[in-house]
């Protein structure tokens, strides 16, 4: 029973859309200013649930991130043919996958033709699965939160090399990029955060983007909780899983504080912790601003 619950969470796909979204109804932000606003930030996808546009955010010096150049997402293992065509129409040139080897073996990405696939594994999967199993056996909400707080510390201290390579990879060509993990919230959330900080977006606006996961996945979180309770015959209070299924401000603030404590500032972390040069930063800003 616990194994089934684990699979439900990590697949993050208890049900699929019964109808395919018409390709003609999907926004292309880069070429149509009608869609360049918050109402269209979440992309309409059949087989993913947290795929979104990072364009439009303002920097502290008055510039804006270009629309249609940078996307974050959850896993792409269930996307439809129409989804694949949509990603191609968006002009995405590369997909960067932060999932572990085990996650990718279980749910391999469907990569549309003409799009490069790049693996940059961050292996928190095994620990996450153990935590969920422990939760279903009676751990508290507080103990659940501590796992993701610790994970965000590790993004800074243990996986800075991966995130540095990620930022450098974004600037090695001129094309749009999409990056993702499993749920599109923790590993991808930190990747989005450091990218936005490097581009000059304020910390508060970065946190607002981070927190949008809860808004965009609210219905699915409720569905997952209900399904787990049903599968365990209501012998488990699946509510204690809520901190794992969504995001909390404390998670990303912990990552920021860890970086600031060690490096003095977030920009120092990007320069010295991620080994991003001033030339790299200029190239990043030229591409995305």
Q: Where are each of the predicted segments found?
A:
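Cys-dependent protein tyrosine phosphatase-like superfamily
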Residues: 17-177, 191-289
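Ser/Thr-glycine-rich phosphate-binding loops at phosphate-binding pockets of nucleotides
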Residues: 183, 187-188
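Hydrophobic h-region of N-terminal signal peptides that target proteins for export
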Residues: 10-18
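Generic cytosolic/nucleocytoplasmic N-terminal low-complexity/intrinsically disordered segments
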Residues: 2-3, 15
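Sec-dependent signal peptide recognition
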Residues: 3-9
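Catalytic nucleophile loop of clan PA
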Residues: 180
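General helical secondary-structure elements
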Residues: 1-2, 22
């Amino acid at each position: 029973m616990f194994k089934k619950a684990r699979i439900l969470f990590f697949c993050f796909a208890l049900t699929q859309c019964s109808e395919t979204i018409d390709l003609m109804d999907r926004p292309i932000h880069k070429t149509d200013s009608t869609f360049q606003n918050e109402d269209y930030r979440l992309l309409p996808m059949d087989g993913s649930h947290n795929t979104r546009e990072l364009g439009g955010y303002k920097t502290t010096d008055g510039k804006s991130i270009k629309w249609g150049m940078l996307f974050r997402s959850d896993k792409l293992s269930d996307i439809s043919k129409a989804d694949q065509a949509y990603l191609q129409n968006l002009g995405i040139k590369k997909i960067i996958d932060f999932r572990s080897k085990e996650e990718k073996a279980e749910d391999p990405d469907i990569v549309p033709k003409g799009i490069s696939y790049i693996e940059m594994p961050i292996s928190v999967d095994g620990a996450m699965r153990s935590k969920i199993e422990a939760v279903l056996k009676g751990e508290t909400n507080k103990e659940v939160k501590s796992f993701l707080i610790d994970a965000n510390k590790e993004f800074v201290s243990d996986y800075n090399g991966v995130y540095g390579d990620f930022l450098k990879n974004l600037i090695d060509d001129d094309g749009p990029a999409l990056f993702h993990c499993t749920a599109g919230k923790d590993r991808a959330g930190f990747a989005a955060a450091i990218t936005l900080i490097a581009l000059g977006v304020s910390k508060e606006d970065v946190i607002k983007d981070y927190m949008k996961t809860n808004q965009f996945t609210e219905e699915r979180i409720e569905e997952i909780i209900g399904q787990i309770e049903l599968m365990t015959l209501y012998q488990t209070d699946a509510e204690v899983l809520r901190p794992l299924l969504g995001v909390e401000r404390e998670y990303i603030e912990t990552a920021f504080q860890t970086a600031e404590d060690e490096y003095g500032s977030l920009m120092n972390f990007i320069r010295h912790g991620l080994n991003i040069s001033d030339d790299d930063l200029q190239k990043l800003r030229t591409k995305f601003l």
